[in-house]
């Protein structure tokens, strides 16, 4: 599908649940969220029909997200069914890693190509402060399980926050000297709980690179790795993995955006950073034809803005939490 700005839209991010077994400070309130009624969340067969229709319109890549997607019962056979769909070339999953020791091998056998693991600190006490629950050792066990299952490339997503974990960027980069993993540093975005933290904790990509340079780390250029996302990759001399940067704010990558997002409640978002959502669940459950649902996907592509407006005044007045969007 080609949008109004000649971008090839071929990537669909699918949030299969709003539930999560962590409470990360930039993602959701400490008390959690009122859970969406199960009847409002799409059934797997509904997701599958929509993904198949999207594939018929040109979607080739699918990323499964949450919440935490591995908490949803039946996720492994769902991955297997998506992977075998006509037109789908790549299926990936974003997770906090806690359940990977249980699921990594099964996911690989089901056809999952790769995983992104969210991890914002390497320090046990700080991990508890950022996630509010959980143990960092469990995440590392999950990372090792993903590597053992050959879910390559294994990527670590690190949201950098000033005064919280910005003093760890060099430590994260050094992981690539010891492990065949790809560490991606992500700028904090003013979405949901991140909105209230943005002004005081936002760290630019250039500031992150400067912190690495202060500790003697020299980043060389790297052509990039499989994934089709917005990260720009570098490498340290002798490293087994890479260091990537995702600059949603300081140097937005909207000009090369290639994706749509489908929420757990069946809302199609043309842009992660837009308030616009197009309802798919209602027509789907009212018996809409595949042709009608395909036209809704086309409508979403036509509605994609050229770029986000997260820094505009009033952006955060009606926030949608990251865990609800499936960012």
Swiss-Prot record:
Q: Which residues bind S-adenosyl-L-methionine?
A: 26, 67, 118, 189
Q: Which GO terms describe its biological process?
A: Mo-molybdopterin cofactor biosynthetic process
Tell me the domain of life. Bacteria
* SUPFAM superfamilies tied to this protein: Radical SAM enzymes
| Sites where the protein binds [4Fe-4S] cluster 1 | 20, 24, 27
Q: From the Swiss-Prot or TrEMBL record, what is one GO molecular function term?
A: cyclic pyranopterin monophosphate synthase activity
Start and end residues of each Radical SAM core domain: 4-226
Q: For [4Fe-4S] cluster 2, which residues are the binding ones?
A: 254, 257, 271
Q: Write the record's keywords in alphabetical order, separated by commas.
A: 4Fe-4S, GTP-binding, Iron, Iron-sulfur, Lyase, Metal-binding, Molybdenum cofactor biosynthesis, Nucleotide-binding, S-adenosyl-L-methionine
Q: Where on this chain does GTP bind?
A: 13, 63, 94, 155, 259-261
Subunit details for this protein? Monomer and homodimer.
The role this protein plays is:
Catalyzes the cyclization of GTP to (8S)-3',8-cyclo-7,8-dihydroguanosine 5'-triphosphate.
Q: Under what name is this protein listed?
A: GTP 3',8-cyclase
Q: Which organism is it from?
A: Heliobacterium modesticaldum (strain ATCC 51547 / Ice1)
Q: State the taxonomy lineage.
A: Bacteria, Bacillati, Bacillota, Clostridia, Eubacteriales
């Amino acid at each position: 599908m080609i949008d109004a700005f000649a971008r090839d839209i071929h990537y669909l991010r699918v949030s299969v649940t709003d539930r999560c077994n962590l409470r990360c400070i930039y993602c959701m309130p400490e008390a959690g969220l009122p859970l969406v009624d199960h009847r409002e969340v799409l059934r797997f067969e509904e997701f599958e029909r929509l993904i198949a229709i999207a594939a018929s319109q040109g979607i080739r890549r699918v990323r499964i997200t949450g919440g935490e997607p591995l908490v949803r019962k039946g996720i492994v056979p769902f991955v297997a069914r998506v992977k075998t769909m006509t037109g789908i070339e790549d299926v990936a999953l974003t997770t906090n890693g806690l359940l990977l020791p249980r699921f990594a091998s099964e996911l690989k056998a089901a056809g999952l190509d790769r995983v992104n693991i969210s991890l914002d600190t390497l320090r046990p006490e700080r991990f508890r402060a950022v996630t509010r629950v959980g143990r960092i050792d469990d995440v590392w066990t999950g990372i090792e399980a993903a590597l053992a299952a050959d879910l390559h490339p294994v990527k670590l997503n690190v949201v950098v926050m000033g005064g919280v974990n910005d003093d760890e960027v060099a430590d994260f980069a050094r992981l690539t000297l010891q492990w065949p993993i790809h560490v991606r540093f992500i700028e904090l975005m003013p979405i949901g709980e991140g909105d209230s933290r943005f002004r005081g904790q936002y760290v630019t990509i250039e500031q992150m690179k400067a912190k690495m340079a202060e500790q003697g780390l020299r980043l060389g250029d790297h052509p990039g790795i499989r994934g089709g996302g917005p990260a720009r990759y570098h490498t340290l001399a002798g490293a087994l993995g890479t260091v990537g940067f995702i600059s949603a704010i300081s140097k937005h990558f909207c000009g090369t955006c290639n994706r749509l997002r489908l929420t757990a409640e069946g809302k199609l978002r043309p842009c992660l950073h837009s308030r616009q959502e197009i309802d798919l669940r209602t027509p789907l459950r009212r018996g809409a034809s595949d042709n009608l649902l395909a036209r809704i996907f086309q409508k979403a592509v036509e509605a994609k803005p050229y770029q986000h407006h997260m820094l505009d005044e009033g952006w955060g007045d009606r926030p949608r939490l990251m865990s609800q969007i499936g960012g």
